[in-house]
Amino acid sequence: MPTNLELKARTDNQSIAAVLQRLKARDLGLVKQTDTYFVFRPGRLKLREMNSSRSELIWYQRPNSHHRRYSNFKRIPVKDPQSLKNILASSIGVKAVVKKKRRVYLFKNARIHIDAVENLGTFIEFEVMVTKGRVQAQDLLSFLRRAFNVKSRSILVTSYCDLINRLRKKPK
């Protein structure tokens, strides 16, 4: 099963573009994503619809932690996302819908995401693919955290889904 080492943080860092350029990170483009999270345990289950053309069902499991968030995941392509969404919504329920614009970069064996999430703000996320061992993944994540000056107070321990649900529950 594939594994990533992940870190997600709030950002308003104006120097992100300069850091990406200095690292020579490869720009893979902008993707509009709608993630529909379903009521599911263990782990999380979401249907990701991208740029109105590609979709995939993703299951993942990871701890809510500041440090060493390893995520085990499985994903499959989906040809008819609307039908699958209707079936899952009817059978197990929808937990939240997260809409975002994601700029994706690649640096070594890490994906760097700059996410503009509807109603939440801007975030940076590192997904280090654990393909060269855990020590290398931890070292690369630490390097990226320093390079982008990610402070501990800005690190998120939950998913966008949890943040959206908290926002919905706040009294107006």
What does each of the following model-derived ranges do?
Residues 1-109, 148-172:
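N-terminal strand-loop-strand beta-hairpin
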Residues 2, 17-19, 123-124, 135-144:
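Glyoxalase I/VOC metalloenzyme domain signal
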Residues 96-132:
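Conserved, surface-exposed functional patches that form binding/active-site neighborhoods
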Residues 132-157:
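Mixed-charge, glycine-accented linear interaction segment located at domain edges/termini
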